[in-house]
């Protein structure tokens, strides 16, 4: 009884403290208390529920039977919207706080919400090497199932809660993208419900214009109801090499060289300052040296970016064997390095051993409990951006990031961008090697002002024919946005499919004014 009594006393004291200080004060100044006592246990309950649900649904093979009925229900909702006069635009009914993006869309309150309850894996076809999934299937679900049967996605984006729909309608990337491209480039078919309630399937050879226009469109051409994605044979481990590199010129040269080597299954860099980085290259393998096995996904292990930093501090190269699923979700426990700002002692060994099994808190729950004051503070004093620029511009880009926002660590992830129709493609007619530069954290540039600094960064990205990931704050005006993205095919299909009265334009969903 004593532990229960102690816990009850602590909870009572905490509630009294909240009453005296005010909930907003606690959420802003001692947010870690709220996160540790409430959000971590709640996140664990969410994870257990969704894991058990997905396992039961797949084992009973009920998802394919239910899928057709759910799609018909979506079509019915769209047709009812038309019969009622199509008075407002449509959007998905999923609450904005459930998404992984930093902001919540204001349009959810004014648009017609179409409920889309599609969160299951429908089929794994190992002969055709295809997995067919619904749009709300998460990367955590995908890895749990596929790796257990010896398969994986060629590109498997990092965070557990990222959904297939978000990765298609937005975008997704991983350290294998230098071989396979973005997430959209491993998809072979999309199934959608259009503005008139009709159902359509599109592939590179069937309804190809729609197939190439869907990625990055943020649900403004139709409602995604299923996708077919390539799968490849998996191996048990990733043989990962760590190489610290000093000097910006050497970093850029080494990273470019490793990104061009197709024998590397994975390439990633963590930049800890403008002239200090660790470059990691990996290959999948079934063989392991037991003395070099590192199960980095175990809850008591150090956060991955801190583990990598040790190679830089000691200026030594390293070789480790990491279980494949642990590698895929190596940044999940620390949400890259964002969790250090929420739970400052989160990487402390004592905290990891006692509470690490509950980490991380759900990003959706962090958003839900953010509050307006904290949201404004984050906007002015926190940056979460992914900018995609040609690899040949890497050195120039890193100088620009240093001058405009000065955030470290910086994530470096290469990808090949094919010359295909759609919103995003290289400037020329051939595939080109690009790099995702991810900046997440508190800017250390003097007199940082979010709007002016980010507009300066966006201007640079446009000037080198780069792209901004659309989950992040976008300060561009409409003209600048369409200078960055190729809207020719997109606008043609919007008119052809009757989307102009059914869905907002993509800019109106992602611009700063559309989110809070």
UniProtKB/Swiss-Prot annotation:
EC code: 1.3.1.72
Catalytic activity: cholesterol + NADP(+) = desmosterol + NADPH + H(+); lanosterol + NADPH + H(+) = 24,25-dihydrolanosterol + NADP(+); 5alpha-cholest-8-en-3beta-ol + NADP(+) = zymosterol + NADPH + H(+)
Keywords in alphabetical order: Cholesterol biosynthesis, Cholesterol metabolism, Endoplasmic reticulum, FAD, Flavoprotein, Golgi apparatus, Lipid biosynthesis, Lipid metabolism, Membrane, NADP, Oxidoreductase, Signal, Steroid biosynthesis, Steroid metabolism, Sterol biosynthesis, Sterol metabolism, Transmembrane, Transmembrane helix
Keyword Disulfide bond included in the entry's annotation: no
Binding site for FAD: 163-175
A GO CC term assigned to this protein in UniProt: Golgi membrane
Cofactor(s) this protein requires: FAD
Pfam families hit by this protein: FAD_binding_4
Major subcellular site: endoplasmic reticulum
Location in or out of the cell: Endoplasmic reticulum membrane; Golgi apparatus membrane
Cytoplasmic side: 53-516
Ranges that cross the membrane: 32-52
InterPro entries: Diminuto-like (IPR040165), FAD-bd_PCMH (IPR016166), FAD-bd_PCMH-like_sf (IPR036318), FAD-bd_PCMH_sub2 (IPR016169), Oxid_FAD_bind_N (IPR006094)
Lumenal side stretches: 23-31
SUPFAM superfamilies: FAD-binding/transporter-associated domain-like
Pathway the protein takes part in: Steroid biosynthesis; cholesterol biosynthesis
Gene Ontology biological-process annotations: cholesterol biosynthetic process; skin development; tissue development
Signal peptide: 1-22
Molecular function, one GO term: enzyme binding
Domain of life: Eukaryota
Subunit annotation: Interacts with DHCR7; this interaction regulates DHCR7 activity.
Role description: Catalyzes the reduction of the delta-24 double bond of sterol intermediates during cholesterol biosynthesis. In addition to its cholesterol-synthesizing activity, can protect cells from oxidative stress by reducing caspase 3 activity during apoptosis induced by oxidative stress. Also protects against amyloid-beta peptide-induced apoptosis.
Family: Belongs to the FAD-binding oxidoreductase/transferase type 4 family.
Protein name: Delta(24)-sterol reductase
Species per Swiss-Prot/TrEMBL record: Macaca fascicularis (Crab-eating macaque)
